[in-house]
């Protein structure tokens, strides 16, 4: 008998709250079996699923080992801690929270340094004058090396940072930094600026799958159910349901509505009584309502959608293709 599908989610703070809210919106209620301090949990209604509450960095390492099947973690941690990440894990879907950029930041006083090419010149000159390489404080060692190599920068050395990286230039432990930032305000408060082409990675929380986990039939079916929930909720969030009834609707009018407003008719054209159901992007609701009334509709109703379940699930299809490759 195969073991459970193990899903790792952040164990504390805003990331945990956002992850639980994300699953909750998809109809997947997470709960800790032993109370708030427990690090194991369940999803209501799914007996073959175990939730593991871990730090975001631990989630990335456990995905690399294949100790968990799915995990919620930042792309920055995946790219930094997992060599050849695209071969070992699959970023199934972005989750819309935890957004931040990994950036190269230099002192604002370096007024002539705006690009990575400028930085290359500065690092070369610095080594010639001081007989040692310029120091870069960061916890993103692998991302820094790859990005600097792509820009041909070699005259630097990394100073590994455990925390408060943005303060390193001010206290004299480094000349510049590579760090993660959401708004840039902390960098600015420490007298730093992001280079114009210095964004290494635009990161956010992702749902990630491990290739090396045990993907036997039980865990695979549980993953299909979870991804079905997630896709159904994501599809529903893109539309509102519009319903009306009138005799003047035909294929040409539906084609025009699709082209002008991006609507789809999930159940085909109108019924014999003239009933018509459309899915419409929220921003186009009023325009579509005006269009339908101009063509003869007396009443147009609009409702929110909780879930839209399609025959095919592109999220699970991506996972299946990844595991087969």
From Swiss-Prot:
Sequence intervals crossing the membrane: none
One GO cellular component term noted in the UniProt record for this chain: cytoplasm
Originating gene: hisG
GO biological process: L-histidine biosynthetic process
Gene3D superfamilies: Periplasmic binding protein-like II
Subcellular location: Cytoplasm
Main location: cytoplasm
Keywords, in A-Z order: Amino-acid biosynthesis, ATP-binding, Cytoplasm, Glycosyltransferase, Histidine biosynthesis, Magnesium, Metal-binding, Nucleotide-binding, Transferase
Cofactor(s) of this protein: Mg(2+)
Family membership: Belongs to the ATP phosphoribosyltransferase family. Long subfamily.
Name this protein carries in UniProt: ATP phosphoribosyltransferase
Catalysed reaction, written as an equation: 1-(5-phospho-beta-D-ribosyl)-ATP + diphosphate = 5-phospho-alpha-D-ribose 1-diphosphate + ATP
This protein's pathway: Amino-acid biosynthesis; L-histidine biosynthesis; L-histidine from 5-phospho-alpha-D-ribose 1-diphosphate: step 1/9
Name of one Pfam family that matches: HisG
Task performed by this protein: Catalyzes the condensation of ATP and 5-phosphoribose 1-diphosphate to form N'-(5'-phosphoribosyl)-ATP (PR-ATP). Has a crucial role in the pathway because the rate of histidine biosynthesis seems to be controlled primarily by regulation of HisG enzymatic activity.
Signal peptide: none
GO terms of molecular function: ATP binding; ATP phosphoribosyltransferase activity; magnesium ion binding
Activity regulation info: Feedback inhibited by histidine.
EC number: 2.4.2.17
